[in-house]
Amino acid sequence: MSISLLGRIVSQQFSGIRAAGPGRSLYLPFTLLLKQPGAYKVTLHRYVHSTQTKSHLSFLMNNNDITPFQKFTVKVLKEQCKSRGLKLSGRKSDLLQRLITHDSCSNKKSSVKINEPKKKRILINDPIKITKKLVSDKTFRTIEKNISSLQNTPVIETPCDVHSHLQPRDRIFLLGFFMLSCLWWNLEPQESKPTIDH
């Protein structure tokens, strides 16, 4: 019998005591039961359908027992699959298998520790002691590294870099082009002048 049902039965049998307040009235149905001598022997029974399965299920999951899973209904198994983000369709055996594999994988993942590299803190306020010898060695080392890296890089030469001076054939071509342009320029004004016949 649930508590709400018990409250209804008691309120029907007893009218209750009226608790008076300023402009308010409240009936307390259980106060008469407390004043009766046999009222302390009231027992309540909770049936299986009214218990919460989530607390039991989490206890069973922690113990990794497979057999108690089979006692749950398909509806409860689907709720558990939904809470874990698993597929909801299938038979009861499929749901059981998904829950068992998911829990075994999650237990393995929680047991494996991920070692993250510790971040080094750089304190800006602390002065750094550098000797002149260290600075001079460092500059020579960096210069040597730069020179060696420049020597190792491939040199890409453009045609202008390869042939920076004019070849004799280029000189002949440019001289000929210049002379033809001058001749053509001199011939053009003579053709455009009107001829006067006397």
Curated annotation (Swiss-Prot):
Superkingdom of origin organism: Eukaryota
Matching InterPro entries: SAP_dom (IPR003034), SAP_dom_sf (IPR036361)
Topology of the protein relative to the lipid bilayer: Single-pass membrane protein
Domain SAP: start-end pairs: 69-103
Transmembrane segments: 172-187
Family matches, as Pfam families: SAP
Boundaries of the annotated transit peptide in chain numbering: 1-55
PROSITE patterns from the UniProt entry: SAP
Keywords: Membrane, Mitochondrion, Transit peptide, Transmembrane, Transmembrane helix
Gene Ontology CC: one annotated term: mitochondrial membrane
Cellular compartment(s): Mitochondrion membrane
Coarse class of the protein's main subcellular location: mitochondrion
Gene3D superfamilies, per database record: SAP domain (1.10.720.30)
Sequence similarity: Belongs to the AIM34 family.
Record protein name field: Altered inheritance of mitochondria protein 34, mitochondrial
